Amino acid sequence: MSALKNSLDPVQMLCLDGDGIGPEITAATRRVLQAVDDCFDLNLTFTTQDIGFVSLAASGTTFPDKVLDAAKAADGIVMGPVSTIDYPPASEGGVNPSGFLRKKLDLYANIRPAKSYEGLPPRVGNKVDLVIARENTEGFYSDRSMFFGRAEFMP
């Protein structure tokens, strides 16, 4: 991803809808980001590229090269969930978008907040307010959809 420029330049956000509920999640995220932009004049601009099953049907791969080019040019990426467990083998176009982006853009942290909100009772146990930081400085995450390859597997 590109480095942020001066505050007057547009901030290029790339939206990757993903599979299943991904389009719904990225649309909601985009609305939130637009509301933040309206309040703080961040000058966000949004573009969308297809990944996942939509891309597989259109181009023969779940992550086309043009998406990587767009990701490298973007200042930020919003990516919805993907159904990697259901993808065909890589030899048939089933590339794991999140793993591919992580490797190609040298990303090493996955931040996952979890918080209980008033009016929504917790399903199990007590309320929570935590952030899980999953780092990847040793070179790989275990990938549940990979059964062979570069030491990234879960039997």
Where are these regions (language model features)?
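Short, polar/charged alpha-helical segment
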Residues: T26-D37
